[in-house]
Design a protein with these regions (language model features):
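Structured core elements
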Residues: 42, 66, 77, 158-160, ...
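Beta-rich nucleic-acid/ligand-interaction surfaces
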Residues: 43-61, 162-172, 266-274, 367
Length: 387
């Protein structure tokens, strides 16, 4: 049996009804980002491998599809994340001194899916703010992220917050290899106490105790006060907890409908984050529907270190979580060569109407569009009448 019609695992066609919903959401989110002052950029899907891996942290290379450029012989990759590309654009092509707000929307490709029911070809929408190190930029990005989920129609959203500086402060002065740090981060995120105890057995007592405490620091805003009592009074730890508390206060005031949570041990999927990180969860999805945070070091790989904060989400995932929007009713029109008919159809389309012309021989066929009106001739005029 031929398999020419089969697609690779976790790769799927997007059919008309879903494609329409994705495109409507894409336009809506880009318009929303523009209302915040964001400028649209469109990085290439294909880029030199070393550029795609710059500043992304350990473990990123395994997600990239790789190939050899037949023109130059260099290694190329299909992007798995757009953020490094936007950092390159900010650092080299725009090269501005002040605040730069950028947004993007395009496909990314993963060698492995992030979850059991996720696509290996997400349609990634994201926003980045460069040039401001203060919490004001973090708050603006989080406001924008929550607005995006609201526009998508998601209900019962929970925003989960953490900070990479907590682990940095706890591990300050402790030399760990990249592999050891990755294993430790994974154990913390999974709250695997047995593995964590094994990995920390040879560390200084104060460091070990703090690492064993981190997995228990999750819950509501009260977790921040508990963390102050139980974690070392390191400057990075104190700054992280103070910033999280400041953000929690502002978010609760502006978005009272959002549940706020904290998981101070979860950093597994935030390889290049340097400060505040956040993720959003919604009813009907076990994994986060949106991730973001601060990554001030990402531009250094391109020769220009700039404060940076942003988020990204997958439009395909969002569309799958909300009820389908009704298709806008259309106007049915006969096919004809008369100039007056063609002008009437054109005028309706210019007014924003969907006009479906019934081709000869197909008058009795149903179409996908819900036509509730038809274009008919009355005397010498073409008029729209209800069906």
């Amino acid at each position: 049996m031929s398999s020419a019609w089969l697609l690779p695992e976790h790769i799927a066609d997007v059919l008309p009804s879903q494609a329409r919903r994705i495109e409507e959401l894409r336009r809506d989110l880009l318009d929303m980002a523009r209302s915040y002052g964001c400028e649209l950029v469109i990085p290439p899907l294909l880029e030199h491998l070393d550029s795609l891996l710059s500043g992304t942290g350990a473990g990123s290379e395994i997600k990239l599809f790789k190939l050899v450029d037949q023109l130059s012989g260099r290694s190329l990759g299909l992007r798995a994340d757009t953020t490094p590309q936007v950092a390159r654009i900010d650092a080299h092509l725009l090269n501005r001194r002040g605040v730069t707000r950028l947004c993007y929307c395009g496909p990314v490709v993963h060698t492995r899916p992030d979850g059991l029911n996720t696509s290996r070809e997400p349609l990634q929408f994201g926003v980045e703010i460069y040039g401001h190190a203060g919490l004001e930029a973090d708050l603006e990005v989080q406001d924008l992220a929550l607005d995006a989920l609201r526009r998508a129609g998601l209900a019962e959203v929970m925003l989960d917050l953490g900070d990479a500086r907590l682990l940095q402060g706890v591990l300050d002065g402790v030399g760990l290899s990249a592999d050891a740090l990755a294993a430790l981060t994974a154990a913390l995120a999974a709250k695997d106490m047995a593995t964590l105890a094994h990995l920390t057995a040879d560390l200084p007592a104060g460091t070990r105790d703090a690492l064993l405490v981190l997995p228990s620091l999750y819950g509501g805003r009260e977790v921040l006060a508990e963390a102050q009592r139980r974690l070392p009074a390191h400057p990075l730890v104190k700054a992280a907890l103070a910033d999280l508390d400041w953000l929690a206060g502002h978010l609760a005031a502006v978005h009272p409908e959002i549940r706020l949570g904290f998981d101070l041990a979860d950093l597994q999927r935030y390889a290049y984050y340097t400060g505040i990180r956040f993720s959003a969860y919604a009813q009907g999805c076990a994994d986060a529907v949106l991730r973001g945070g601060r990554y001030d070091e990402i531009g250094a790989a391109f020769g220009r270190r700039r404060p940076a904060v942003g988020f990204s989400l997958d439009l395909k995932t969002l569309v799958g979580l909300v009820a389908p929007t009704p298709l806008r009713a259309a106007v049915r029109a006969p096919w004809g060569e008369e100039a007056s008919l063609r002008q009437a159809v054109r005028a309706l389309r210019e007014q924003g109407e969907t006009v479906v012309c019934v081709l000869p021989g197909h008058e009795n066929e149903a179409d996908e569009f819900d036509c509730d009106r038809e274009l008919v001739r009355e005397h010498t005029e073409w008029v729209v009448r209800a069906l």
